[in-house]
């Protein structure tokens, strides 16, 4: 089942990761609310995610990098990915990075190609 969650703490991130990755892939969408590029990337992502079949086994968490900068940096460090915003990080069921992109790399086409893998 696809769903979008907001996480606000490191504990919530760890809980989501531990409960989700057993059965689903996890998308982490990091954004900055006041940024135009983040706004556009979020709209593209929301449209793509909304178009997925309901039975898609994907969970998404959105992270406001202004409000949650330490969490955003923790995720980047844990996954060995440079912190950026907007940024989408796609984890497979094993918790490994399947795809990641930032700014103008976040497109419906790129997401569709990753979904097909």
Language-model segment annotations:
Residues 7, 30, 54-72:
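Thiol-based oxidoreductase modules, predominantly thioredoxin-like and allied folds used
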Residues 24, 83-85:
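Short, small/polar residue-rich loop motifs at catalytic or cofactor-binding pockets
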